[in-house]
Amino acid sequence: MRLQTITRALAAFLLLSSPTVAAPPPLPQLQAYTVDAAWLQPMEPLRIADHTWQIGTQELTALLVETQDGLVLLDGGMPQMADHLLANLKRRGFAPRDLRLLLSSHAHADHAGPFAALKRSTGARVVASAASAVMLARGGSDDLHFGDDILFPPVVVDRVVMDGEVVAQGGVEFTAHFMPGHTPGSIGWTWNDTRDGKPVRLAYADSLTAPGYQLLANPRYPRIVEDYRRSFATVRALPCDVLLTPHPDFSGWDYAAGAAAGAKAMSCKAYADASERRFNAQLAEERRKAR
């Protein structure tokens, strides 16, 4: 009895005297593709809805959806994030083998980077559009805009989806919405969840930016402007109570803010409108320089 009392007292002392746990350091950079440190800053799972969690980093979205039959992950961030994502699965009380599906938005290293490692370690199946499947299989090489500058480990897609196709897992239906532009194979996803028991429609819309892209007379992507226009309209029409995007700041999210992360989150319409304004300004500048 005396030993138990001493043990409890010692435990209480250690708890009170322990220093505040500091934030973990950022994940290491890749020599070939360096990014902002916040893109690599780990974070613990952040609740978005009752069964949907952000488990990526402060500036890269990776959404974990917990279903009645395993887990679904929408995007994964950078290649070096695989172990971090698996650690966050464990924080949620799951094992790697519980991951069933990897849903892709687009085939860039900062979103599909860890898919190969995750597929290998969990057995999860990769789902993407046909255009993205080609890019995923070659690890981002010969990209329309970036060439071989942002490579990632190649991964074979297990299921190719069409626009409007539904992917069902454990009672949750994920609908694919084609939104080409940022890449020809870009996809957004919508599904239903609850928040505090009330129904909520979630939309994960793909990036609508055109970073350094040639928009006029692009020989490798001649329909790029038309595709962006169509995608702006697609995003506006999504069933959308809560919007999330691969880069959270573009849709008003601040994952570092914890419980207040979505305080300034945009609607789907506001996101599409803001993206189209930026696109129009970029297009006008390109036209001006071409004169």
Where are these predicted regions, by residue range?
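Conserved beta-strand hairpin/beta-sheet module of binuclear metal-dependent hydrolase folds
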Residues: 38-92, 96, 188-210
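Divalent metal-coordination and catalytic microenvironments
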Residues: 51, 65, 75, 85, ...
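C-terminal regulatory/interaction regions
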Residues: 267-291
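Bacterial N-terminal signal peptides
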Residues: 8-18
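Metallo-beta-lactamase
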Residues: 24-34, 41-43, 47-49, 71, 78-80, 98, 156, 166-168, ...
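Active-site HxH/HxHxD metal-binding segment of metal-dependent hydrolases
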Residues: 80-83, 90-166, 263, 271
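Bacterial N-terminal signal peptides that target proteins for export
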Residues: 1-9
